[in-house]
A protein has these predicted regions:
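Sec/Tat signal peptide C-region and signal peptidase I cleavage site
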Residues: 16-21
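Post-HEXXH active-site segment of zinc metalloproteases
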Residues: 137-163
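Peri-catalytic and regulatory segments of divalent metal-dependent proteins
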Residues: 22-145, 193-197, 203, 209-225, ...
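Bacterial N-terminal signal peptides
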Residues: 6-15
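A general structural-boundary detector
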Residues: 8, 29-30, 171
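Positively charged n-region of N-terminal signal peptides that target proteins for export
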Residues: 1-4
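Metalloprotease/metallohydrolase-associated module, dominated by Zn2+-dependent proteases
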Residues: 36-40, 155-205
Length: 238
């Protein structure tokens, strides 16, 4: 009797295995987890490559206060679990570079230009949304960089090709204007404690950039006049 019972259970388990193997919900979450792991690994690889390429005379360091502030803003996003980290480059040129997985690189020039807490929150929050919406990963895939960088990840550290990694990083940096900056602006504002106040602060800051920077050096973060227009049109929830 026990033998038949055990046999029946084995048959039942075997019959369930194909169903579980193709379970779309399980497959979705497994794929999502794998993609997140790949995203974090790619971000770490790009960050290390960026740091290795940086000239010694320009200092770059992690900013604990800004990192904590970014993580606090990320609590209101769909990807609060990522380890958001802010690196600051000692450069007068305002710039910001979101990397996959949670790293944000900003210049001291950008932080100096952001004269209020609301403006700094805007910078951090919009980059939280870039990362939360996987804009950096979409850019990597759209530019055809994904297979190459995955291949480098699978290679042992000491055997990775620095020339290939350098090209990946440069191609990514060159195409940052293609990120959806308008969407990051509009959704990032909603992460802050006072979206309306942040919106006004953002408009003021971007207008100052459009006068000082945009006419002579189009900024990497998209079409400034168009971004300002979208922020001015934005209707916030009551």
């Amino acid at each position: 009797m026990h033998r038949y019972l055990i046999l029946s259970l084995l048959i039942s388990c075997l019959s369930l295995q194909p169903v579980m193997a193709v379970n779309p919900v399980m497959r979705y979450f497994t794929q999502l987890l794998d993609e997140t792991r790949a995203e974090i690994a790619i971000g770490e690889l790009m960050r290390e490559q960026f740091l290795s390429e940086f000239p010694d005379y320009l200092k770059i360091a992690s900013d604990t206060d800004m990192s904590l502030r970014m993580r606090k803003l990320a609590e209101n996003s769909s990807r609060a679990e990522l380890k958001y980290n802010v690196l600051v480059i000692n450069s007068d040129i305002p710039d910001e570079i979101p990397l996959p997985g949670g790293t944000l690189i900003v210049t001291s020039g950008l932080l100096t230009a952001a004269t209020t807490d609301d403006q700094r929150d805007f910078i951090l929050a919009r980059n939280v949304m870039h990362i939360a919406l996987k804009h950096p990963m979409k850019l990597i895939k759209n530019e055809g960089l994904y297979p190459t960088i995955l291949n480098q990840l699978k290679t042992r550290t000491e055997q990775r090709n620095p020339l290939i990694l350098r090209k990946i990083l440069r191609d990514y940096l060159r195409n940052i204007p293609k990120l959806d900056h308008k969407k990051a602006d509009l959704q990032g504002i909603l992460l802050t404690s006072s979206p309306d106040r942040t919106r006004k602060a953002a408009i003021e800051m971007l207008k100052s950039f459009s006068i000082r920077i945009w006419p002579v050096l189009p900024w990497d973060t998209g079409d400034l006049p168009a971004r300002i227009t979208e922020l001015e049109k934005l209707k916030l929830p009551e």
